[in-house]
Amino acid sequence: MIKSELVQRIADRNPHLYLRDVEKIVNAILDEITNALSRGDRVELRGFGAFSVKHRDARVGRNPRTGAHVSVDEKVVPFFKTGKEMRERLNNGVDD
């Protein structure tokens, strides 16, 4: 599912909301999560999961096509850990 499909599904389930308002809400939520992560904060949505950032050290990698060694710079990457309720729902089937 892509963002536009998510917006459409939320709008379909909430006919009292305009599609453009749902899109603004979804964008605002994603912007706030992104801003928090860029500050190094952790974002926890109980039952869903937690977004955080992890530091990856510089390392020597390998080009899969040529086999040549390449230097990979250190970087910060986003990380998501699922919550207990989400793991249980995924393992017990999905409700629509």
Swiss-Prot record:
A family per Pfam: Bac_DNA_binding
InterPro entries, A to Z: Hist_DNA-bd, Histone-like_DNA-bd_CS, IHF-like_DNA-bd_dom_sf, IHF_beta
Single GO BP term: regulation of DNA-templated transcription
A GO cellular component annotation in the UniProt record: cytosol
Source organism superkingdom: Bacteria
MF-aspect GO terms: DNA binding; structural constituent of chromatin
Keyword entries, A-Z: DNA recombination, DNA-binding, Transcription, Transcription regulation, Translation regulation
Classification via HAMAP family: IHF_beta
Complex and partners: Heterodimer of an alpha and a beta chain.
Family matches, as PANTHER family: DNA-BINDING PROTEIN HU, INTEGRATION HOST FACTOR SUBUNIT BETA
Protein family: Belongs to the bacterial histone-like protein family.
Cited function: This protein is one of the two subunits of integration host factor, a specific DNA-binding protein that functions in genetic recombination as well as in transcriptional and translational control.
UniProt name for this protein: Integration host factor subunit beta
